[in-house]
């Protein structure tokens, strides 16, 4: 189906472009959300007559998104989640979780604005892109941790999972050394008693 785009759509074109899209995409997404018009003679005339108004409305929306983006860009949000010892989350962090975290801090983000290739399933610092407008995108940082203390350590740049494994390795080495010292001393005393 040929449609006239009413705003810039990534991968499709800019305002006023006539593009050919799949029927379902046009009927279920573009037309109901008023992102496009069917490309026929009547709609082309309507679009050309209202082009200046549509461009002004789009510019105003872009400016508002830009102002909101200045406040959001580079901000950090802490999400406390349960996870295993390897740092694997019990569940995942989705676009809805990101939007909820931003909105809890006073932002205005819908989950459809959050761009995630796949859900986040590990602890740590994660960069997430939020598309506020078709031409305005910002990046926020998610600090996903098991506790606030862990989140603070991660914010300082510490790799919490690696340090946890290092602490466990050192404790195991110390326990092994203690066993060797205790075991060697006991064997020597048993040997001297047997000699006597």
Swiss-Prot record:
GO function terms (MF aspect): rRNA binding; structural constituent of ribosome
Region feature Disordered, mapped onto this chain: 174-196
Keyword terms, alphabetized: Ribonucleoprotein, Ribosomal protein, RNA-binding, rRNA-binding
Pfam families registered for this protein in UniProt: Ribosomal_L9_C (PF03948), Ribosomal_L9_N (PF01281)
InterPro entries listed in its UniProt record: Ribosomal_bL9 (IPR000244), Ribosomal_bL9/RNase_H1_N (IPR009027), Ribosomal_bL9_bac/chp (IPR020594), Ribosomal_bL9_C (IPR020069), Ribosomal_bL9_C_sf (IPR036791), Ribosomal_bL9_N (IPR020070), Ribosomal_bL9_N_sf (IPR036935)
The organism's place on the tree of life at top rank: Bacteria
GO BP terms, alphabetized: translation
Key word Ribosomal protein present: yes
GO CC terms: ribonucleoprotein complex; ribosome
Polar residues bias (residue ranges): 186-196
Recorded family membership: Belongs to the bacterial ribosomal protein bL9 family.
Known role: Binds to the 23S rRNA.
Protein name in UniProt: Large ribosomal subunit protein bL9
Recorded name of the encoding gene: rplI
